């Protein structure tokens, strides 16, 4: 049974993930786009791959129980997967802060929705202020 085209466009494949330190380091070193609240921080940098990509950093120090860490990561991936077609080509890192484990699933989803909207606005503003590169 093959997936319909509509299902395929919302996939979250390996090419949409930040997988190793060489993917994460440029974003940590220079993230011109930031969106945060008291429990979640999203760092973003415009990507050269032409796709939005996601990396997750969920420390045991901030979310003690493994089931809560996994739940946080699942909700983060799902929100990214559903919003990926609205996002510009960015490399995004989602970091969990202290207190994120006390949020309900509904609160987490709502927070991620708001943060992704802020990321889109900031990315649009950043691309509008950057001069076009001519080669």
Curated annotation (Swiss-Prot):
Keywords: Endonuclease, Hydrolase, Nuclease, RNA-binding, tRNA processing. Disulfide bonds: none annotated. The keyword Ribosomal protein does not apply. Its EC number is 3.1.26.5. It catalyses: Endonucleolytic cleavage of RNA, removing 5'-extranucleotides from tRNA precursor. GO terms for biological process: tRNA 5'-leader removal. One of its GO terms (cellular component) is ribonuclease P complex. InterPro entries: Ribosomal_Su5_D2-typ_SF, Ribsml_uS5_D2-typ_fold_subgr, RNase_P, RNase_P_CS. Pfam families: Ribonuclease_P. Consists of a catalytic RNA component (M1 or rnpB) and a protein subunit. HAMAP family: RNase_P. RNaseP catalyzes the removal of the 5'-leader sequence from pre-tRNA to produce the mature 5'-terminus. It can also cleave other RNA substrates such as 4.5S RNA. The protein component plays an auxiliary but essential role in vivo by binding to the 5'-leader sequence and broadening the substrate specificity of the ribozyme. NCBIfam families: rnpA. Belongs to the RnpA family. This is Ribonuclease P protein component. It comes from Saccharophagus degradans (strain 2-40 / ATCC 43961 / DSM 17024). The gene is rnpA.
């Amino acid at each position: 049974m093959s997936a319909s085209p509509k299902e395929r466009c919302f996939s979250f494949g390996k090419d949409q993930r930040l997988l190793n330190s060489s993917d994460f380091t440029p974003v940590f070193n220079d993230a011109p786009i930031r969106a945060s609240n008291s429990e979640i921080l999203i760092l973003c940098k415009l990507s050269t791959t032409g796709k939005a990509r996601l990396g997750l950093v969920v420390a045991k120090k901030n979310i003690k129980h493994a089931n809560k860490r996994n739940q946080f990561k699942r909700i983060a991936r799902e929100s990214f997967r559903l919003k990926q077609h609205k996002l510009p080509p960015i490399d995004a890192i989602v970091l969990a802060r202290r207190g994120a484990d006390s949020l309900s699933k509904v609160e987490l989803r709502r927070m991620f929705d708001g943060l992704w909207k802020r990321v889109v606005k900031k990315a649009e503003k950043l691309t509008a202020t950057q001069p076009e590169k001519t080669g």
